[in-house]
Amino acid sequence: MTTIATGLRLALVVAVVTCVSAQNSSPSAALRPLVLTGAIPLPNVQGRIDHFGFDPNRIFVSALGNNTEEVIDLGAQRVVHSIAGVATPQGVVYSPETNKLFVASAKGSVYIYDGTSFDLITSIDFHGDADNLRYDGADKRVYVGYGDDETAAIGMIDATTNKRLDEEFQLGAHPESFQLETSGSRIFANLPDSKQIAVINRKTHAISRWALTLQANFPMALDEPDHRLFVASRTPPRMAVFDTDSGHMIAALPCVQDSDDLYFDSARRRIYVAGGEGYISVFQQKDADHYQILAKVPSSLGARTAGYSGKMGKKGFDRLYVAVPARANHGAEVRIYTVQD
């Protein structure tokens, strides 16, 4: 009888410990919104890596410190071409209608390449720090953020003719990330030097400005249907949410330091923020006014730029691509994080 009672007590203890252990481990298992599933080496790439561009089967990576634009085939998961001679490349966009690749240089030019051969078609001089690029497929226009102080503006290129348009929007401070409305006429632009967000009406050319209490606002994403703008700041490190109608800040949550790219996953109502601190901040949008931190996904020190554009490639997986600069113990690479529901 004593042996039986002892066995029962032991079984009960094991069951309780197992239950508690399962309860403690289940949240971390459930909260894995991003899973590292691969990496694509960037051979011979040194220095800082800047922004990403996409077409349905390729990724374009601006290797700023290497003066190259790297072309990755998603199916093969390897670099298939390296465009040399691009002085400090920053923003990059692909125009599917014209099969052209546009690459912005910190030296002031935008280079235009054939999207198949990658032969240089022409370059356009914007006279200072051509940075972020955005493409409007409806008008076949490439929007270019460029300049400093008096020259700072968002200009435009006709993707069909390869000509710079006379029309531009003067801002008085260098624009970092900016987003275009697709169903409206506004552009939202981060102006970290003036601690503002500029709101540009493309039809009337009117520009309003939202003053910020946060500083160093670089990356940005737009949830157009819900009228929400997501902005990451570096001082302090925050992911802030703004009402695009009123300019009012709805929320501000702590996030990764040294952020440079931010994306909104409309299917899962999530925000991904990549930062040089060495992880990716993932937030959940509970509704348009309420947000919570979902996970801190490890990446690598200095990995502050990323690319996300929803389902891509033949398999149709949602993936976040994170640029990891070369270090003494490893080469440069693009890490692949598969998005989990």
Across the structure, where does each feature detected by a protein language model lie?
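N-terminal secretory signal peptides that target proteins for export/translocation
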Residues: 1-6
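Predominantly soluble domains enriched in secretory-pathway, periplasmic, or organellar proteins
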Residues: 19-341
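Bacterial N-terminal signal peptides
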Residues: 7-19
